[in-house]
């Protein structure tokens, strides 16, 4: 059975791409009456506030018609930012050699929170170098992953 997030992703790809952007990813966070649907959009030319507003209007219309979420929620549309969340194997592969932080569902090497360098991606497996050790992590074990920005 498809998750709500995967259904939402399939529903929102076309309207986001119709406006010339790509759907980087999304998160649906349930918090009682304060649930939030975060939609991240990207574009090789960057994302501006007007882009977020345009996409928000477009996908709000789709969400109003399709009504995939039965409870009240807040819609947030933004760029992934410098500490961008990572959702897919392709996104991790794009940042080979970069530092990421991951929160895991099940511990790996005794920890659910890891910070390391992306050493490789093969299929749905991420190789992360943490303190000189290579750890292989299934992408479906990653609850949340973020790029660590360099300054």
From Swiss-Prot:
Its main location: cytoplasm. InterPro entries: Ribosome_maturation_RimP, RimP_C, RimP_C_sf, RimP_N, RimP_N_sf. Keywords: Cytoplasm, Ribosome biogenesis. One of its GO terms (cellular component) is cytosol. Disulfide bonds: none annotated. GO terms for biological process: ribosomal small subunit assembly; translation. It is found in: Cytoplasm. The keyword Cytoplasm applies. Required for maturation of 30S ribosomal subunits. Belongs to the RimP family. This is Ribosome maturation factor RimP. It comes from Shewanella loihica (strain ATCC BAA-1088 / PV-4).
